[in-house]
Design a protein with these regions (language model features):
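Active-site acidic/histidine proton-transfer and metal-coordination neighborhood
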Residues: 1-85, 95
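Histidine-acidic metal/acid-base catalytic patches
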Residues: 49, 66-88, 92-173
Length: 173
């Protein structure tokens, strides 16, 4: 519950849309917005933001509803509350839609958190994958974002701590 999240000192909680299960995008937005409109005021009362994660439905989360930026933005507009935002997972959105930097710039007001991960494979964000994270981080900084960027990858190297340190270094712009 939001009260527990606030008591623990956290300012946001991540939520998920669930799967399509045959629903149209419009019906999914309507259903999610209906539920979120009940939750968001409670979270707001406790100073907590609700953040829905954008995930890919091609590789990792088959049938997931909130699998593209446009759908997420429409949901934010339907909820109509500053206390509800999106988590832009760079790994997932590269798989689903590409055009990462332009999408971040275009929808910056809807994003309140970011996750990293190398594509393909969700490994380190180094030269072994297709994204150039220094440019992505510069774009995020240019939007005025001052929050955290979470390193959310599965280390392929022998030392996970070294991989994490490298990821932090790559993102330190």
């Amino acid at each position: 519950p939001p009260a527990d999240v606030a008591a623990a000192g956290f300012k946001s909680i991540i939520c998920f849309s669930g799967n399509r299960e045959g629903m149209s995008e419009e019906e999914g937005i309507k259903n999610c917005a209906k539920g979120l409109k009940q939750i968001v005021p409670i979270a707001y009362k406790h100073g907590v933001k609700i953040v829905m994660e954008l995930l890919n439905s091609k590789v990792n989360h088959e049938d997931y509803m909130c699998d593209n930026s446009i759908w997420g933005v429409k949901l934010c507009d339907a909820v109509g509350a500053d206390e509800f935002k999106l988590l832009y997972d760079i790994y997932h959105m590269q798989i689903m839609e590409g055009d990462v930097i332009a999408t971040i710039r275009k929808n910056q007001d809807y994003y309140s958190h970011y996750h990293t991960g190398g594509v393909p494979g969700r490994h380190e964000i180094d030269k072994t994958q297709e994204l150039y994270y220094p440019a992505i981080m510069e774009a995020i900084v240019e939007t005025g974002y001052t929050g955290y960027v979470a390193q959310e990858f599965i280390p392929a190297g022998p030392d996970p701590l070294t991989s994490l340190k490298q990821g932090v270094h790559i993102c330190d712009v």
